[in-house]
Amino acid sequence: MEALSQIEGRAIPYGAKNVDTDVIVPAHWLKTITREGLGRGAFETLREVPDNIFDSEEFAGAPILIAGDNFGCGSSREHAAWALLDLGIRAVIAPSFSDIFSSNAFKNGIVTVVLSQYEVDRLMEVAQSDPIAVDLETQTVVTPFQDRFPFEIDPFRKHCLLNGLDEVGLTLTRDAAIADYESRQKTQTPWLTTGTERAA
């Protein structure tokens, strides 16, 4: 997982409330188990409308998405996070998120930023023409107009995102401790490993 410190650039001022995971990525995209190419399915039904914001050249490659209350509600499909990531989104800002979506986003290296409705509205306004930045180190969202909006994030999640640690990467940071434990287990409880070693 790529380490994150600051995410800066244009933000897609979407703003819709109660956006469920079926809107983020329709069910027929769930047949795939690969993450590559899922960005084509992100907001597919909305992109069928001409001049939609997700296909606008102005917001091409935008790393930030601004949404409304309860973003990511509905089914728990992890493909929703995969699709956003493949679209290039590294941070989503909203007044609230579905807990399951927020967890899936974190596990895939997407920062979910909770701000007040007033702050989200202000960022929606700025995003129409100017970039914004999400600073994970200082836990603030800033604009070119001196707006500084602090946000909360779980310390463990912050550590993992800053260091690019997914579940596998986090386990590997404890590799020496795991090896030490396994060595002690072989000595203290040899009957647990003898049969396995013979089979190997």
Swiss-Prot record:
GO terms for biological process: L-leucine biosynthetic process. Keywords: Amino-acid biosynthesis, Branched-chain amino acid biosynthesis, Leucine biosynthesis, Lyase. InterPro entries: 3-IsopropMal_deHydase_ssu, Aconitase/3IPM_dehydase_swvl, AconitaseA/IPMdHydase_ssu_swvl, IPMI_Swivel, LeuD. It holds the Pfam family Aconitase_C. Pathway: Amino-acid biosynthesis; L-leucine biosynthesis; L-leucine from 3-methyl-2-oxobutanoate: step 2/4. It catalyses: (2R,3S)-3-isopropylmalate = (2S)-2-isopropylmalate. It is an enzyme of class 4 (lyase). SUPFAM superfamilies: LeuD/IlvD-like (SSF52016). Belongs to the LeuD family. LeuD type 1 subfamily. Catalyzes the isomerization between 2-isopropylmalate and 3-isopropylmalate, via the formation of 2-isopropylmaleate. Heterodimer of LeuC and LeuD. This is 3-isopropylmalate dehydratase small subunit. It comes from Erythrobacter litoralis (strain HTCC2594).
